[in-house]
Amino acid sequence: DQKFSLSQKDSLAGGNLDVYNSIYFQELKYKFQQSSVNDYFGQSFVQQEINDKIFLNTLNIFGKVSYKSDGLGAIDLGLRYIDDRYRLENFAIDDYLDNSKIINYKTTFLNASYKKRIKKFDLILNAENFLFGDNKSSKLDSELKIDLKKDNFLVFKYRISSTAPNYNHILYRSNYEKYNWDN
C-alpha cells in the first residue's frame, strides 16, 4: 500500500488531496485425498484413490484519488482491477469431466465514496460498479448515523448488491455421484 499527499490543508489550502494505490496477490490451495472410496458418500464414478486439488490465484490492484475538506467532506474516486484464476485438478475421473476447465475472470470496477458530518448527522455512501470484464457485480452501501442525547445514536443502513460468481458452484466436481452440482 502506498499513499501520496499532493496537497495538505493549511491556512491557504482548504483541503487535502491524496493518491492511494494497493497491490495484493493471494494464492490458495485445497487438496482432498482418500486412499479408497468411502461407502458413506454413496456411489462413485470409479473405485480408486480420490485426489482432488483446487487452486485460486487472485491479483487485486486498486488506486484512488481522495479529497477531504471541511466544507465538502471526504470524496474518493478510484478503480479496482481483479484477476481471478480458479481451477480444479481431478485425477480420478478424467473420462467424465473436462479437467482442463479454468475460470479466468478479469474485471475492472469503478469505486466512489462520500463521507460528511453535518451537525448531529454522519452520512456515508460507498459504491463499486462493474465497468468491463467478466464479473458483472456491483454494490451500493449507505449509512446515516444520528447522534442522540448523551452517548446514544441511531443508525440507518441500506445495501444493494449483485454478487460475484460462486466459483465453487461453477466448477465443482466430485468423484461421488451425488456430490456434483449438475446431477
Predicted regions and their residues:
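Outer-membrane beta-barrel translocator/channel fold
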Residues: 1, 151-183
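Residues on the lipid-exposed face of transmembrane beta-strands in outer-membrane beta-barrel proteins
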Residues: 2-10, 61-67, 110-116, 142-146, ...
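Short loop/turn motifs that connect adjacent beta-strands in outer-membrane beta-barrel proteins
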Residues: 6-17, 68-74, 119-120, 149-151
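Structural signature of outer-membrane beta-barrel domains
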Residues: 7-9, 24-31, 82-86, 130-134, ...
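Transmembrane beta-strands of outer-membrane beta-barrel proteins
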Residues: 15-23, 73-77, 123-125, 154-156
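Outer-membrane beta-barrel translocator domains and adjoining extracellular loop/strand segments
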Residues: 31-38, 87-95, 136-142, 167-175
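Transmembrane beta-strand segments that form the barrel wall of outer-membrane beta-barrel proteins
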Residues: 120-133
